[in-house]
Regions:
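Small-residue hinge/turn detector
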Residues: 66-78
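Glycosyltransferase-associated regions of secretory-pathway enzymes
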Residues: 1-65, 81-175
Length: 175
């Protein structure tokens, strides 16, 4: 069973913007029985692996969150949302069905370079939300993938740059 806790990451020590506050309010509205936990520099070791340490050093906090979300759910289980995700209805039916992941479909039926895994017109988009029990093997697999990666600053034109969306989709398609 997925624990009743919603996790989100907020690195960089800046205040939450109005959109994030609005989205978090929607989580409270539609998932009132859930604890909401913010992860930041005070409760997550940004130096846990070289990838996150370098991303944090370069102030690319979203990339720190990419690894952190896997680590957090592996340790504690629960649901992860990016701070721009608004919940618009109760999710009891989805959560009761077990582990879940958000996904996107290319509306044109074609891959958009850099956004989707090669050969697929859909992508797992974990920032949209995903829920898992602690210690799920897929979480460990993703932690291992990131542990072996070097963080490199994305080029100015990131249309081809590989992101968490592509890494996750490719890992699932290999299963």
């Amino acid at each position: 069973m997925i624990p009743k806790i919603i996790h989100y990451c907020w690195f960089g020590r800046n205040p939450l913007p109005p959109l994030a506050q609005k989205c978090i309010a929607s989580w409270r509205k539609y998932l009132p029985d859930y604890e909401i936990k913010e992860w930041n520099e005070d409760n997550f070791n940004v130096n846990i692996i070289p990838y996150t340490a370098e991303a944090y050093r370069q102030k690319k906090y979203a990339f720190v969150s990419d690894y952190a979300r896997f680590w957090i759910l592996h340790q504690f289980g629960g649901i992860y949302f990016d701070t721009d995700v608004e919940v618009i209805r109760p999710m009891d039916d989805i959560i009761a069905a077990g582990n879940f992941m958000g996904f996107e479909i290319d509306p044109d039926g074609e891959n958009t370079p850099g956004r989707y895994a090669p050969r697929y017109c859909f992508s797992v988009a974990l920032g949209l939300g995903f829920g898992m029990e602690a210690s799920h093997p897929f979480l460990k697999k993703m932690l291992d993938i990131y542990a072996g990666m070097k963080f490199e600053l994305p080029p100015e034109d990131i249309s081809w740059y590989k992101t968490i969306v592509a890494y996750t989709t490719e890992a699932l398609c290999k299963e």
